[in-house]
Amino acid sequence: MRLGSSRVAEWIVVFGFPARPDGRPTPELARRIAAAALAARRWPEARLLVSGGPGRRSPAEAAVMAQRLRAHGIGPDRIVEDDAARDTMDTVRAAARLIPRGTAVVAVTSAYHVPRCVALLRIAGLRARGLGATAGRRMGRAGWLYWTLRELPAVAWDVVLALWLRAMGRFGAA
């Protein structure tokens, strides 16, 4: 996770990950929350969009993230919750509806997920860069292979879908 950029971020878009049924964040979600808190302190004027709906047996990811960010000292007036998003594309479409085109945003998510999120936010017309929440331990070859095989088709699918939605005027940009 690197925060060295001097470029301004007007919005921080935090992509969700399932919470535990009792409302506590999973380790993956906790890393994203910690990275978002660091980014919020780095860019104190930036607003945060936390995104993610409820799971089958867990509360909305956005609510869990917002509560934890407030516990990290991030003001509630800076946090916008999107509790309807079911996946990455839903989060990007919510960002495109809320944030004006050309706005500088930082996508906070897991490191393996950054390329897809940044590409989609850029297709949505936002000036995006990513901040990957690093794992607490090394992923290893099996983990790397799993996430690579998972993300490659997802990137291809989502990019094609985003380009089609944009061409049809249905991407939702502000």
PLM region descriptions:
Residues 174:
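Active-site cores that bind ATP or allylic diphosphates and position pyrophosphate for catalysis
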Residues 2-146:
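A structural signal for short, hydrophobic/glycine-enriched beta-strand patches
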Residues 141-171:
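A transmembrane-helix-recognition feature enriched in membrane-embedded lipid enzymes
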